[in-house]
Amino acid sequence: LDVMDTVPSADSKTFESDSSVVPYNKAGSVIQTFTIPSDLEHWKTSTEEGQLRRQALSMAIDRQAICDKVLNGLGTPAVEFTSPKTPGYSDSLKGNENLKYNKKKAKELWEKANAISPWTSDDKLTFAYNADGGHETTYTAVVNSINNTLGSEVAATNPYPTFNDYRTAVSDRKVQGAFRSGWQPDYPSAENSLVA
């Protein structure tokens, strides 16, 4: 193998010290996200309950811990919806506190949403991803962070065996929960990430 464009995060600590390879490890412009359908029960963007739950969920995810421990320092916690390499990127956009881990505030917002419409033991937000793409450890960590903050029965993973299976389910709108998404811009512009 002469060229490898991606190194699994589990191997990232050793590849740079391996004398048999010439490593290249620089930040890129990809952003990894997940999407919650706007009409999903308890998560509807048109309702106060849905808005509170989305805000609580975002604050329940310890992005820094995931970047440090799961991705071995290869990620940067999001503070907006483009990457630090994108022209126009800002780490001080109004409202970016919603993208920062805040266990106390997350619980408070979750309880406000529960006062509107209670989350029951029958409810669970699942996170779909393709198992053949190296996403399992990341989504397990996301789910663990959410459950450790909001309650052990809030979230679960929903892996699909292959990217094709996953993409078909997303495109056919058969995923009944959150699903992995992201973007690699076609050209260096915030517009390409935000309007795409």
Segments from the language model and where they lie:
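Extracellular/periplasmic solute-recognition and catalytic clefts
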Residues: 1-40
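Soluble non-cytosolic domains of exported or imported proteins
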Residues: 6, 47-52, 60-61, 96-104, ...
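Ligand/substrate-recognition segments at binding pockets and active sites
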Residues: 6-10, 111-185
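Short, solvent-exposed loop/turn and secondary-structure capping segments
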Residues: 8, 14-18, 68-72, 80-81, ...
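Sec-exported extracytoplasmic/periplasmic mature domains
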Residues: 20, 41, 58-75, 87, ...
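Alpha-helical secondary-structure segments
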Residues: 29-79, 122-133
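Extracytoplasmic/peripheral linker and loop segments enriched in polar/acidic and small residues
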Residues: 51-55, 59, 67-68, 152-166, ...
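Structural transition elements
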Residues: 76-113, 132-137
